[in-house]
Amino acid sequence: ISVLPEAATCSHILMMPQKFFDIIGKCPEDVKVLYIPTAGIETDGAREGFAVCFQELSSMGIRYENILVYNLELILSKDYQRTYSTCVTDPYMLTRLLTIEELQSFDAVVVSGGDAAVLCREMIRTGFDRTIEKAINNGLVYVGISAGSMYAAGNLDDGLNIINNPIIPHWNGTKIIELPDFGEAIKIVDGQAVYVEDDCISLI
């Protein structure tokens, strides 16, 4: 799912590069991406997706040096009181919760596939769920791949719930050509995406 200010797209938007850059409004070499792999770090099958995603981003013309990998599992819990690390007065950004301002320095956040429940758990544990929601409402583009799209849709009580409909990615049945009714599951085949901008939802 990808998101504009109060908006979102889903599943394989990276397979639609022109649409992606139209949304961002920048040339590929100028685009900065925050990549969140957290949903896919517990199985090798999901980890394979990291290489695929990086290849897709690179083939679109996005520079590797403009992609920051941000794994929520490395971030301290939001209520944890630091002990022996208190001597570190300016922790490196990959080891702490990003601020809204830092998050908004990126043009898009790409949230990978894997286990949506793991992603949701880590979002809540770290408090990043609140940060990313505020950044999206301020204009950050959200691109959810598989589990990342489920987290943004209506699949999880504690997800972003940008749309009320749950999303079922990698659907191997009949390709849908129109959206189902409010609250019903949106079954997306690979290569298809749901795009949300403000109150408008569409298939692309």
Task: Give residue spans per PLM region.
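Active-site-adjacent pocket-lining segments in enzyme domains
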Residues: S105, V111-S112, A116-V143, G148-I204
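N-terminal beta1-alpha1 cap of cysteine-dependent amidohydrolase-like domains
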Residues: I1-A108
